[in-house]
């Protein structure tokens, strides 16, 4: 069954741990059915770093909320989702809620070129993402300047490939 994700940066704001964040609505589909519905919470600091403050997620049809977390609750900490000035070798937590969400990234390259859906992107940031909670999974993610995420490739623990298909304005 074909799968796809839809991600929308909303106009909604929320305050978490004293910081005003932006709500990003992320839905995952199998065919035409929503299988995961998530609100992700992000904020950008004065230096340009983008922080991840948590997520409120629900899997359907089970209605499981496993993986939901919020910075400042149960000792969870916000993590970096994107560094303003990344350097090869930088390592950082993207999210840290012990035994719930412990994703980490390592910067592998700042000058990749990738072609996705017939569009070539240059000076692409390449990260390697891992988690202590899923030690058998390693994913490479590619971020293009002025665009953001364009490609994800599972390099250990699966063969998934996620590509940016289109960018558009969301209706939320």
Task: Please give the residue ranges for each predicted region.
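Conserved functional acidic sites
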Residues: 1-172
């Amino acid at each position: 069954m074909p799968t796809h994700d839809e991600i929308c940066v909303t106009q909604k704001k929320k305050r978490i741990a004293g910081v005003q964040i932006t709500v990003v609505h992320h839905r995952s589909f199998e065919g035409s059915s929503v299988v995961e519905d998530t609100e992700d919470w992000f904020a950008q600091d004065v230096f340009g770093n983008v922080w991840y403050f948590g997520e409120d997620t629900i899997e359907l049809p089970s209605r499981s909320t496993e993986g939901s977390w919020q910075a400042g609750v149960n000792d969870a900490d916000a993590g970096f989702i994107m560094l303003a000035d990344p350097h090869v070798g930088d390592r950082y937590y993207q999210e840290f809620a012990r035994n719930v969400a412990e994703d980490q990234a390592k910067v592998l390259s700042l000058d990749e070129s990738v072609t996705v859906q017939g569009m070539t992107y240059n000076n692409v940031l390449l990260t390697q993402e891992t988690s202590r909670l899923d030690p058998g999974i390693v994913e490479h993610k590619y971020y293009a300047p002025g665009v953001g995420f364009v490609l994800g490739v599972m390099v250990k623990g699966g063969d998934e490939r996620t590509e940016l298909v289109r960018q558009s304005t969301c209706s939320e």
